[in-house]
C-alpha cells in the first residue's frame, strides 16, 4: 500500500509528452509510480477533472522581505509554485547597514509597490552581510524552496553610503568592494546578481534605482566576480536603449566568464527596442558564443 495516491488526474509531467489521465503514487518523499491504475494508498486524493503537474519554479519574484517572516509564502504557494527566486531587479535587503534600512525599504516600495509599513514591521533585520541574510532565511521553515540573487541597490548603498544617489560614480576601489561583496554572496549560496536599468524603477521618493546610471564597466566587473566563483546568473531589467549597447557588453561578459546573462524581454513603452529586435539581437550574440537568456512574462504587456 502506498502512502498517498493522487487518482484520476490529467497528468502533465513536464517532459514535453502529451497530457494523460492517470494515477500518481507517493511513498515517503518519493514519487514511486506514475501511470495507470495504481494500488490503494493510505491517503487518496480524487483529482478527476484536475491537472496534476510538477511544482512550478517562479524565477522572478520579490519576496525578499516577506521570506524573513512568512512560512507560507502566499500567494505563490497557493498556485502550485514550489520554488521561487527573489532578489530580482537589483532590489533587496542585504547587505544592509543599520542606517540604510529605511532607504532599502523605500527602494523596494517604489519599485515593486510593496507597502513600506509592512516591510518595516515584518523584518527583524537580524543580518548585515549577505551571507548573514542567507542564514536568516535558513532559520525559518517554509512551504516552498527559495533562492535569491545579490541585489545591486543594496550593494551600492552598502559601499557608497550617503554618496549613493542617481548618477553617483563609484571609484575603482568602490567597484572592487562591490565585486567582493557579490563574490562572497555567491560563494555563500546566492544564485547570482541582479540589477535594474529602467526609468520605470524608482524609489518611493522618485529617485532612479542605482543600476540605471551605472556604467557597463561597473556591471562587467561585478560579473567577473561571479566568474571567479565559477557559477552564477547575471539578471537585469533594462530599457535597452540603443546608445547603451546592452547586448554588446552582456555578450562580452557571458563569453568571458562562461556565465548566463538573463534580461527581461518585454514589449514595454520604456524599451526603445521592440521585442522582436530584442530577441534577434540576443540570438546574434549567442551565435558568437554568449549565453544570453530572455525572461518572458506569462501575461501580456
Where are the regions that the model predicts?
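Divalent metal-coordination and catalytic microenvironments
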Residues: 9, 29, 49, 60, ...
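Divalent-metal coordination cores built from histidine and acidic residues
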Residues: 69-192
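Histidine-rich, glycine-flanked metal-binding segment
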Residues: 1-5, 11-55
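Histidine/acidic residue-rich metal-binding segments in metalloenzymes
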Residues: 131-142, 167-301
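Short, basic, glycine/proline-bearing loop/turn elements
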Residues: 53-62, 164-167, 265-267
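Di-metal (Zn2+ and/or Mg2+/Mn2+) metal-binding site signature of metallo-dependent hydrolases
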Residues: 51-75
Amino acid at each position: 500500500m502506498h502512502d498517498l495516491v493522487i487518482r484520476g488526474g490529467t497528468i502533465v509531467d513536464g517532459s514535453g509528452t502529451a497530457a494523460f489521465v492517470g494515477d500518481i503514487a507517493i511513498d515517503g518523499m518519493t514519487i514511486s509510480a506514475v501511470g495507470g491504475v495504481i494500488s490503494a494508498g493510505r491517503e487518496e486524493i480524487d483529482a478527476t477533472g484536475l491537472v496534476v503537474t510538477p511544482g512550478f519554479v517562479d524565477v522572478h519574484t520579490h519576496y525578499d522581505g516577506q521570506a524573513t517572516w512568512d512560512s507560507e509564502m502566499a500567494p505563490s504557494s497557493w498556485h502550485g509554485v514550489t520554488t521561487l527566486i527573489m532578489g530580482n531587479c537589483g532590489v533587496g535587503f542585504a547587505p544592509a547597514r543599520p542606517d540604510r534600512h529605511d532607504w532599502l525599504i523605500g527602494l523596494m516600495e517604489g519599485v515593486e509597490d510593496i507597502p513600506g509599513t509592512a516591510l518595516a514591521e515584518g523584518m527583524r533585520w537580524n543580518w548585515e552581510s549577505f551571507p548573514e541574510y542567507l542564514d536568516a532565511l535558513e532559520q525559518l521553515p517554509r512551504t516552498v524552496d527559495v533562492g535569491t540573487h545579490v541585489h545591486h541597490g543594496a550593494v551600492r548603498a552598502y559601499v557608497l553610503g550617503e554618496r549613493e544617489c542617481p548618477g553617483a560614480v563609484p571609484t575603482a576601489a568602490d567597484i572592487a568592494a562591490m565585486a567582493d561583496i557579490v563574490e562572497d554572496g555567491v560563494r555563500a549560496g546566492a544564485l547570482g546578481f541582479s540589477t535594474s536599468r529602467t526609468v520605470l524603477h524608482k524609489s518611493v521618493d522618485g529617485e532612479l534605482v542605482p543600476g540605471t546610471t551605472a556604467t557597463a564597466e561597473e556591471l562587467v566587473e561585478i560579473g567577473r566576480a561571479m566568474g571567479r566563483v565559477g557559477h552564477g546568473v547575471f539578471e537585469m531589467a533594462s530599457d535597452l536603449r540603443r546608445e547603451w549597447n546592452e547586448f554588446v557588453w552582456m555578450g562580452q561578459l557571458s563569453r568571458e566568464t562562461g556565465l548566463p546573462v538573463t534580461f527581461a524581454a518585454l514589449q514595454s513603452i520604456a524599451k526603445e527596442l521592440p521585442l522582436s529586435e530584442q530577441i534577434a539581437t540576443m540570438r546574434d550574440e549567442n551565435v558568437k558564443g554568449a549565453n544570453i537568456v530572455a525572461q518572458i512574462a506569462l501575461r501580456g504587456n
